[in-house]
Amino acid sequence: FQLWQKLEPQLKSQNLYELFTSTEMRLMPLLAEMEIQGIHLDSQTLYDYNKELTIGIEDIQNKIYSTVGHAFNIASPKQLQEVLFTERGLKPTKKTKTGYSTDTSVLEELALYDPVPKMILEYRELAKLQSTYVETLPSMCDKNERIHTDFIQTGTATGRLSCREPNLQNIPVRNEAGRKIRSAFTATPGTILISADYSQIELVVLAHLSQDKNMCNAFISGTDVHKATAALIFGVPQEEVTPQMRRTAKTINFGVIYGMSAFRLANDLGISRTQAAEFIENYFKTYSSVNDFINSTIQKTEETGFVQTIFGRKRHIANINSKNKLEKSGAERMAVNTPVQGSAADIVKKAMLDVSKALEEENTQAKLILQVHDELLVECPDNPQTIEKT
């Protein structure tokens, strides 16, 4: 109570009282219910997949050894440095206290020049999935074969929810391995799982904040926004957009939110930096108001020292006026990303509260059990009437 006496006037003076009371405080009991409820895990699916994954890891390992010409400890940074920079003659791009870096960003760049770094990345991804999820999740189940994650409301600076022990939000869904792991999360007998998500919510928020006509029109008309972007930046009709063009546009669409440079785009798409710079230039010609939004957000943050989400959540940006170029560019990325990602997070939190309230009022017996960024997962009794209500 003594803390509240100090904090209440501060929340009100910062115009954060409404967000705190109507969203964050109301969310706490719902998150507690979700943690208690947990989600069912079919451990046998993971046991079976572990055998398949082990074979896959061994296959990649053998390919690496065959290409290099000898066996070595792939997990050893020192041995990996020796293989890449001495034996393969690749040029180091980043130095650490223990030698040249072999982190993901370095390997992604080196993969443009040599097949081994790409294989190392594949090996690491599968090995991490195996150790973090496939081998670990079954041991985290309770007697009812349910896993209970811990949701954290204060774990991110943007307001996004995070979770731990286990982190169920980090399971990749864009590759086959991640989808196999995800398929192990199942409904218990007599129930089904219903998933609902916001389609491209961060891009929708960006369109709203920037009020860019081309981007808003794409969403309002129900057009595939990545296809529409590709058509505009490549100067072709939408029906002539190829899958490769769409992939390029999608990478740029999401990359802009996170301040992607031409260098990073070139690495992601396997193209030259000159071509990547042209794509980004064409993107901002296409969505000129997005460029205006980015510039005005940075300028305003330089003046005030903070940014806000649509709901009024604030984030102070420490190095926005730094003389250090690296610090300032990082601060600028935070300043642009936070209103977009933070607003999306606030919208999803409101949706969680609204959905939970509606399920209770309709007496459906359905329960919200998981939130993964822009997706809500509900466990629902398996009967037609309840499913329709839910």
Region roles according to the model:
Residues F1, Q153-Q238:
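Function-dense linear segments that define catalytic or interfacial modules
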Residues L11-T23, L27, I347, A351-L376:
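Active-site palm subdomain of RNA-directed nucleic acid polymerases
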Residues L27, L46, E202, H226-T229, ...:
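Extended, hydrophobic alpha-helical segments in both membrane/secreted and soluble proteins
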Residues I36, H148-T149, Q153-T156, A231-T364, ...:
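Conserved catalytic core of nucleic-acid polymerases
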Residues S76, N383-K389:
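Short, conserved charged micro-motifs
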Residues L193, N337, L377:
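Short aromatic/hydrophobic contact patches that present stacked aromatics
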